[in-house]
Each structure stands twice: as C-alpha cells, then as structure tokens.
Amino acid sequence: MKEDILRQIGTIARALDSIANIEFKEMQLNRGQYLYLVRIKENPGIISDHLAGILNVDRTTTARSIKKLEDNGLIERKNDQRNKKIKHLFVTKKGDELAEKIEKENTYSNELVLTGLNEKKRQELAKLLQQVEDNASENWHFVKNGGKREY
C-alpha cells in the first residue's frame, strides 16, 4: 500500500487554514495573516527577511502581509538604531489582544485534531512531524536559492 503522507498533511493544513480564515475574517485578518501576527508576537523585533524564512514564504508576500497588519494597527515597525534601512517588527496592544485570541484558537484546534491520541503518541507524532518539517524547509531553501532537485 502506497501512503501519500503529503496529501494527508496538505488536507489537514488546508482544513485548519480554511477554518482559521473564516473565523479570523471578522478580526480584520485576511488569508494567512494570523500566522504573521503570531510569529511577530513570538519574536518581538524580528525583521521581515527573518520572518519570511520562519514561515517559508517569499519576501514579497511577507511585505504585503506586514503592510496590511500595520495598516490595521496590529503591528508597528521601528527603525534599527544603527541601520535605518532595517525595520524591526512589534505587535501593538491591539495586535497583542488579537494574537491572544489566535493562540486560544490554535490550542483548541490542536486538542481537537489530536483527540484519541495519548501523550506518548502525541509526542511521537510531534517528533516525526518536526523531522518532516525540517526536511521540507531544507528543500524549500535549496530550491529558493536556485537549486535543482533531481526526481
């Protein structure tokens, strides 16, 4: 039996992303922007290039999302003290309150999808998925930087 694990992972990711996009729309968040807001909260002062790397998305997409979050008053940019071209990202009070709601939704969704798995299985799954994520991220960076995969 050939298992298509990537298809399963994709189905899970799309379902949860779709739910989040529906629920977060009323909070002034467009598609996927909740990811950016939470990562900025987790990494105060992060720069956009590093944020793009964490999320495995291109810089242009990141810049658009940052602009929308800033326009909605959820984040702010602050100049670097040594290099004015570098902008550090921080959540505002409004953004922090919204990020708290997003984190609650994330905890709820985690519990929901892990229903029926005991703690040992949850830890095993987390370890396996971390390896899959690391492999995917490594390949993403390789291809993004001009590498050619041989399949």
What are these regions (language model features)?
Residues 10, 38-42, 103, 130:
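Short, locally clustered residues in the helix-turn-helix/winged-helix DNA-binding domain
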Residues 120-151:
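C-terminal regulatory/oligomerization modules of transcriptional regulators
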